[in-house]
From Swiss-Prot:
Belongs to the ClpS family. HAMAP family: ClpS. Binds to the N-terminal domain of the chaperone ClpA. Involved in the modulation of the specificity of the ClpAP-mediated ATP-dependent protein degradation. This is ATP-dependent Clp protease adapter protein ClpS. One of its GO terms (biological process) is proteolysis.
Length: 102
């Protein structure tokens, strides 16, 4: 095997090993009880949205039944879902945060 063939083989191996992680959407689901201000607070606190972005997402949740807070690798998405659901329960709101593959 020539040196050129070895280099090409190594380049192929490296490219196939560097796959992007699967990404997941973090979703807030609408309910009839959680105040809009609380949803905005969640979006600012956990997803670092400014007031305008948080308001737009909150309105999408209100009108469409759900809204995307962000798209993250699985581990981060799973952590954010758990944090939001725990924070909502601590504040006695039924708000549900979930994830789905992007």
């Amino acid at each position: 095997m020539s040196r050129t063939e070895n280099i090409e083989h190594v380049e192929e191996s490296v490219e196939s090993e560097l796959k992007q992680p699967s990404m997941y959407k973090v979703i807030l689901n609408n309910d009839d009880y959680t105040p809009m201000d609380f949803v905005i607070e969640i979006l600012q606190l956990f997803f670092k949205k400014d007031e305008q972005q948080a308001t737009e997402i909150m309105l999408a949740i209100h009108h469409k039944g759900k809204g995307i807070c962000g798209i993250y690798p699985f581990g981060i998405a799973e952590t954010k879902v758990a944090q939001v659901n725990q924070f909502a329960r601590q504040n006695q709101h039924p708000l549900l945060c979930s994830l789905e593959e992007a």
